[in-house]
Amino acid sequence: MKRIGAKHLEYLTDDFGIWQHTDGNQIDRTQGYALDDAARALLTAVELIRPDLADVYIGFIERSVTVQPTINFYTADRQPWDRPWSPDALAECYWALAVAISNDVQESRCRRIIETSIAPKIYELREWLRASAYLTLGAALIDQPLALELADQLLETYRTNYHTDWPWPEDTLYYANAILPYALLEVGRLHGHVEASQTGERMLKFLNGICLRDREVHLIGNEGWYSRGGLPARYGEQPIEAAYSVLANVSAYAITRNEEYLEAGGRYLNWFWGENSTGESIINLQNESVADGIDAPPRGISQNQGAENIVCYLYAQEQIWPLLKRNS
């Protein structure tokens, strides 16, 4: 496992935003730009201390969310694309802008975007579970009362859906699953919310038990997901699952100092490097890109290298790398 840089991130980024998809290793301009990618890219730019890139992504978010309705996609010629609005994307923008604010990156501009264009929609956004988790992560950094309120809402959803064999707030494990325990863990870590910490840890242990039970890491795939009483999908594994699982385990380690969480986080990072069902790395060291995921044979590792993958990987890498090097 090596530490990669921002070469592919820079390749995908222009003065307008970050291109959403590639065809092989070339930008697929037919797919344009997406708001959620810009939000995740902002997280990464802040973590990498790249104010030049952060400025691009903040600008994209600003032009997308300060109009009605929110623009979730743009075409290659930089025109709004009439595609469905995403509550998750807007909530991810809140999280990313909060991270920028907490790191003194264009603080006044980011606060203005939140106050004028996202804060008025928070009570609408919180009705979606993952959107609520993204909001919780952002609020944990800049709005303690809101963070505690959102955490209590997540906890109530968890309690309502809880089963002894399924300690999870939904009956199915879907997309970006680890963001749910991560949100609770961060509220517990930053604000001393004991129930949030304990429940987040319980949920994370459940998820780790599913994904890390074999010699290689098996993420919940999108070719069927994993519903209670069924079996986890083995294919359609996506980098965002591994990356967010790194973040959740780093947070759990910060709270408990239990080395098992650091080991688990390292294994999720190693999924990118070959601790997966193919035994092969999905990272291209030459251009510092990350493949779109792992599909069923004979397709296997995707040949495409879109934005979501590289921004999620880099953010997770930078969160856990100092801890791994310190313990090596």
Residue ranges and their predicted role:
Residues 1-328:
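Glycan-recognition and catalytic cores of secretory/periplasmic carbohydrate-active enzymes
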